[in-house]
Each structure stands twice: as C-alpha cells, then as structure tokens.
C-alpha cells in the first residue's frame, strides 16, 4: 500500500478564464453565498473532493489541504482569490466555523488554539436569510428556539464512524 496526500482540494473552478467557483466567495456577498461555499467544502452531492470524502478515504490517504486559507490578491488575474475560509483581513467566513465544528468537543488544556465545544448559528435572520437555519457544532445535541415562547427543535448527532465528524446541521423552517 502506498500512502498519499491531497495537496490541494476544494477550489472547484468551472473554467480557468473567469475563475468562477462556488468555493470562491467574497465575504461581502452575504450569508447565502458563504453557506454555499461552506457546504461545498463540507459535503457535495456530486463526485468531488470535500471534507466528508477525505474522512471516508482509506487509511493510506493521510489527508489534504485547501488551496489557500485566506482571500488575497493574486497578481496574475484581475479578480482576487475568494476561496479562503477567511477574507483578506482575516475575518472569518461561514466555512471557517464549519471547519471549527470538526474539532473534538472535549476541551484540551494542552492546546493554545481555541478548542472544546462550539456552536455557531449561520443565519443572520434578515429578510434575505434562508428559511432553514444552518448551525455548525461539534456537540452531541443542539437545541434551537426561535423567540422566547416558540417551539424548540433538537438535533442529535448521528452515531456514525464514516464521514466528517460533525455534519452540517439544518433546522427546517
């Protein structure tokens, strides 16, 4: 068996002239494009390398890296590269929180990086926000309540050993 590593994944460019891609999203375009980017990095409905696929690969596949973590000016093309999980000013996009939700929920005092349980509600509740509420979390259970006296919806993480550790949570309208 040969071990291998995917050097670059996630860019998903449709052509190399316009450089358009569902993974190239300016943070200023709003929450819906950023949700599309995060979903593409997490799990796609078509054959493509994504985080879920990396987790489903055999042990000989030791991982992979995104093309670039930050948006930046490229120099060779008039448009900036917008495929980062943070913008050029290091402000997080929604895909950043999707990746944070993949870390273990157990707090590790040995780490200097942010760690432990996390929940991020990826819905701005504007008139243009999706009706379904997307949540990124590494917790076993997440409860969502809209307004004080509203009904609570509860998500229980499935007990599976395949795929990404914490699937994207979608609370339906």
Regions found by a protein language model. Name each.
Residues 144-148:
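Conserved aromatic beta-strand anchor motif in extracellular beta-sandwich/beta-rich domains
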Residues 100-143, 165-172:
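Surface beta-strand/loop "capping" patches
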Residues 153-165:
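Short beta-strand segments within Ig-like beta-sandwich modules, predominantly Fibronectin type-III
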Residues 1-97, 112-124, 150, 156-157, ...:
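Substrate-binding/catalytic cleft of secreted carbohydrate-active enzymes
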């Amino acid at each position: 068996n040969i071990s291998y590593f995917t050097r670059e994944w996630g860019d998903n460019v449709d052509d190399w002239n316009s450089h358009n891609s569902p993974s190239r999203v300016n943070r200023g375009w709003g929450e819906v494009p950023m949700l599309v980017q995060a979903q593409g990095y997490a799990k796609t409905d078509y054959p493509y390398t994504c985080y879920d696929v990396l987790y489903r690969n055999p042990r000989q596949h030791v991982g992979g890296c995104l093309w670039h973590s930050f948006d930046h000016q490229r120099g060779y093309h008039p448009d900036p590269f917008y495929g980062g999980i943070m913008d050029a000013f290091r402000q997080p996009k929604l895909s950043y929180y999707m990746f944070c939700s993949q870390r273990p929920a157990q707090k590790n005092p040995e780490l200097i990086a942010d760690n432990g349980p996390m929940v991020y509600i990826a819905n701005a509740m504007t008139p243009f926000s999706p009706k379904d509420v997307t949540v990124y979390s590494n917790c076993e259970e997440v409860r969502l309540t809209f307004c004080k006296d509203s009904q609570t919806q509860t998500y229980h993480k499935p007990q599976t050993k395949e795929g990404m550790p914490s699937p994207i949570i979608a609370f339906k309208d």
